[in-house]
Each structure stands twice: as structure tokens, then as C-alpha cells.
Amino acid sequence: MQIARTPEVPGGKTPPKVGNRRERCIVLPFSSPNGKFRVMGLSVIVAALAAVPPAAPGGSSKVNPRDGLTYQWIPPGSYFTGCLPEDRECYGLERHREKIVVASGFWIGRTEVTQAAYKRVMNAAPSFYKGADFPADRVGWTDATAYCSRIGMRLPTESEWEWAAYGGTAEVPTEPLGSLAWYDPNSNDTTHPVATKLPNGFGLRDMLGNVWEWVQDAGKGPGEHILKGGSFYNTSRDVRVSGRLSAPPDLRHRDIGFRCASSVWPEERSASGSVTRP
């Protein structure tokens, strides 16, 4: 595996441009006889959500007192991976369409974990771009897992993340991608404060763009895990609900962050193990 990186400049300043933009993004191996690398993608971009089946809107939201962030209840539902025949930007692996059923509801962060929350829980400030309400970046899978555990939660599964990212809608969004996500055309090569773009149908922010987000699922190589959603570095072709990267758990890059999830609200687990759902 090879990771393309940008030199980091002390003080959180934007470094000079190096080569073309694709070379400044994280890129991972893709089966190719010529040995080239690219981002792996598996599904449609935001504008191809018409095939997603309808679902009830998200339910209640709560603040986790351990990190101070708001979490949204996402109902069960189903969606399709893969691209529509008319989508000309699909990668080869996206041609296969498959129905995914998320059988149980779950809680998920309304935003990416912020730097203020990360400092509060982990007593650490690893981020390259600085700002209390900016997403925590340069966070590895192991770090993200530890954070979620400390607040009584976990990383979402890839299917949970995708279902949440679709927003429970069967209609093509009327908003352009730029109103939903910080990505290559509008980011100015930096992350941005969370929740400054429009929410999706479940009320979630920045599911696409800003920073890649770790999920539980194992990746392509030994010990690797999956990253979702694209980042401020990526173009619309890579900022897809089912686009994915596979990376080692100790990868800490400045366009990588996360959000937490849980099947049960942490404060509603009793000593007997019974739970309360919304």
C-alpha cells in the first residue's frame, strides 16, 4: 500500500500545493495491471439517491454528557449500493447493485467529533487544522475506537454509516453537493467547522466531505479498516455515500476523523442489562 501525503506545516497553515490534487489525497491500491493507485468507490454520488427506498424520518436526539455532542436516533431501513446505469462517473466496482437492510435502529453523531470534544474526552489535541468546532483530524482507527468506548459508544458499521448518510430519502436532493459538503471546489484546501453545511434527511451534518470517517469494518489488507465519506481534498466523484478507503489503524492523516454510534443510549443501560429505546 502507498499513501500520498502533503507535507505538514507547523501552526496549522495550509501547505503549498504539490502536484495535481489527486496526488494530495489519500490513495490506496486498486487491482490494476499497471500498478496505479486510486480511491476505491462502491456507490452513487449524492445526486443519484433516487433509487434509495423511503423510510420514516429520524427520531429523537440527545446530548451525550461525556463529550457534549448531540446524537441522533436513526430508524431501521434499507438502501441499495451500486450505481444507476446512467451514472457515467461510476468506478468499475460500483456496477453491482445490492440491497442492504439495516434491521435495527441506532444512535449516531449528528456531526463529526469536534476538536473540543476530543480534547475533553482524550485530553489530546492531535489535529492539524485548529478550531474547537472543527472536526478532530489526524485520528487513527485505534484512537477513534478508544474515544467512542470512553463515552459508552462505538464506531458505526459501514452499513449503518451508509444508511445514515442517505438520510432516509428516496428523492434526489434539490440542493447541490456544495451545499451539503466541504469538498475540493469549495473547501480552500482546509477543513471547516462542523454543521456549517445543510443537514441531510436525518438531520446529520457533514456525512460527505470535510474529513474521511472511520467505521468498524475490516478493510482490504491485514488489520486495515474502512474510511467513508470523502474529505475536503476530494472531487465529487470520490465524495460518495458508498465510496470507501482501506487503511491501517494507525494512519493519522489531516483529512481523517470520525463520529460515534451506539445501538443503545449509553445512559440507559441498567445494571441488569435492560435497555430503553426511543
Where are these regions (language model features)?
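Bacterial N-terminal signal peptides
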Residues: 41-50
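Functional-site microenvironments in short loops/helix caps that host divalent-cation chemistry
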Residues: 64, 80, 84-89, 127-245, ...
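A short glycine-rich, aromatic-capped structural motif
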Residues: 62-127, 209, 257, 264
